[in-house]
């Protein structure tokens, strides 16, 4: 099927295909020595955001990725790739760390959007997304963002601001 002749629904079906590659495939294929880092140092960790330090052609980099599962169990663990505020705060913490140590940031975006539950709103979902967007625009380290599949709403924009 030629991509330009596809409807929006057909495009969505392709990017939601359960057997397509995810960050769990791309990270080990692209990077060496990936070490995952956890938590926002405020509330907790969020399995919808995978972040850490790796090497790319012997260059240290910071990797921040939205996680999408392949089955119900994996999707439940990653909240169906809908990050909570602590996920966005974790991403920003790692971006600040990358800037401090002069590491480029590589983000992988794949989300239908941020989690919109009451608890996420109580923990400052809107503020966390807005702060990520604003702060990523001022980082003094290179930022690359790759959209792997879905890029819905502010939940995607929070990791899509790049050079």
Locate predicted features.
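Terminal-region recognition feature
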Residues: 1-150, 154-157, 161-163
């Amino acid at each position: 099927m030629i991509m330009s002749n596809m409807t929006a629904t057909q495009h969505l079906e392709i990017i939601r295909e359960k057997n397509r590659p995810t960050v769990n495939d791309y990270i080990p294929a692209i990077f060496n020595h990936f070490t995952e880092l956890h938590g926002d140092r405020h509330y907790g960790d969020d399995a919808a955001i995978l972040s850490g330090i790796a090497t790319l052609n012997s260059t240290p980099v910071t990797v921040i990725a939205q996680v999408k599962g392949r089955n119900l169990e994996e999707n439940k663990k990653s909240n169906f790739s809908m990050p909570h505020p602590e996920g966005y705060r974790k991403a920003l913490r790692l971006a600040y760390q990358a800037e401090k140590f002069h590491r480029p940031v590589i983000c992988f975006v794949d989300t239908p959007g941020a989690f919109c539950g009451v608890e996420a709103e109580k923990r400052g979902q809107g503020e966390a997304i807005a702060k990520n967007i604003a702060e990523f625009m001022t980082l003094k380290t290179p930022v690359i963002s790759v959209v792997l599949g879905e890029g819905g709403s502010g939940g995607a924009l929070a990791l899509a601001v790049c050079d």
